[in-house]
Regions:
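An N-terminal assembly and electron-transfer interface module characteristic of large anaerobic redox
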Residues: 1-167
Length: 167
């Protein structure tokens, strides 16, 4: 599933740090992993990303093969999250469950279930809004955000376009 993902994520980002938008890290599941399990590879991959990229969080996508193996990805995520004190979000979205739109929905539901509500904002803007389902595919968000700001509306967060994981 990941083989053709390099540089296909064209959604722009305003992030000033290292842009990993184009990166798609993977566990490189082999036939032996399918037979004997891939838990160790997933843990090693998460450890590698944490050691080399120092992320605020990691999203792990369950693909067709990993779903069929049946490894307890949620348990791995909980252990890695506790060990490293970062969010590790599991998105159960194997391709055989449905369309790309369903995959996007499953990703959004994972964020809602595993991230939203884990902390409150430091300040609350009286006219703050959250954009849900905004993908900023061609940078269109950057066109209307200034208009909203001119009329006193502040975009507090965006799911999933030009969003950030603040923990």
């Amino acid at each position: 599933c990941l083989g053709a993902s390099w540089e296909t994520r064209a959604t722009p980002s305003s992030w000033n740090g290292e842009n990993n938008t184009y990166m798609g890290y993977c566990t490189d599941i082999t036939t032996n992993d399918v037979i004997f399990g891939g838990s160790k590879k997933l843990e090693e991959s998460i450890e590698y990303i944490i050691a080399n990229k120092n992320p605020k969080g990691i999203f792990v996508y369950e693909t067709c093969v990993t779903a069929m193996i049946g490894d307890d990805m949620d348990d791995i995520a909980r252990r890695m999250q506790k060990k490293h004190n970062i969010s590790v979000v599991i998105v159960h979205s194997p391709g055989f469950v449905g369309s790309k739109n369903l995959g996007s929905r499953l990703g959004g539901e994972a964020v809602l279930e595993q991230l939203i509500g884990t902390r409150e904002p430091e300040t609350i803007h009286p006219y703050g809004i959250n954009l849900i389902g905004e993908y900023n595919v061609t940078g269109d968000m950057w066109q209307y955000t200034p208009i909203l700001e001119k009329i006193g509306i502040k975009v507090v967060s965006a799911l999933a376009g030009d969003g950030r994981l603040e923990v």
